[in-house]
Amino acid sequence: MVEYDYEELLERAYEQLPEEVLEDRRFEMPKPKVSVEGKTTVIRNFKEISKKLDRDPEHITKYFLKELGTAGHVDGGRLILHGVYHPKLVEEELKNYVEEFVLCPECGKPDTKLVREDRQWILKCEACGAWSSVRRLK
């Protein structure tokens, strides 16, 4: 049986980590560009937000519609919400989405994926390897 000392084991563990985990970068939540057009509220940079968060635009849309209790749809990279909502409220809901469905509850990093296991949604962290269940959006 091969014996390893602590330093050798630590070095082996660091070699197996993906590069993006080793670099220390700060996550900046995207700021929604919100405008009110008549009786609708439009998030103009919705496509960029979904790319930055690495989430399906449909999932983010479901979250906003459920939390705001409204109807809406995605149109050409914009999220159109029926009703007038203050930009601060939209920003707060996006922050809540990020905390619940993007950031790892264990290490706080945004390097996560939403994975469906059977009928349960799991937030899988690619940085620390943690798995945690998240609520299902209907």
Curated annotation (Swiss-Prot):
Pfam families tied to this protein: eIF-5_eIF-2B
NCBIfam families: aIF-2beta (TIGR00311), PRK03988.1 (NF003067)
Family named by the database record: Belongs to the eIF-2-beta/eIF-5 family.
Task of the protein: eIF-2 functions in the early steps of protein synthesis by forming a ternary complex with GTP and initiator tRNA.
TM spans (from-to): none
Record-given protein name: Translation initiation factor 2 subunit beta
Keywords, ordered alphabetically: Initiation factor, Protein biosynthesis
Protein's gene: eif2b
Annotated PANTHER family: EUKARYOTIC TRANSLATION INITIATION FACTOR (PTHR23001), EUKARYOTIC TRANSLATION INITIATION FACTOR 2 SUBUNIT 2 (PTHR23001:SF3)
Domain of life the protein comes from: Archaea
Molecular-function annotations in GO: translation initiation factor activity
Signal sequence range: none
Organism: Methanopyrus kandleri (strain AV19 / DSM 6324 / JCM 9639 / NBRC 100938)
Oligomer and partners: Heterotrimer composed of an alpha, a beta and a gamma chain.
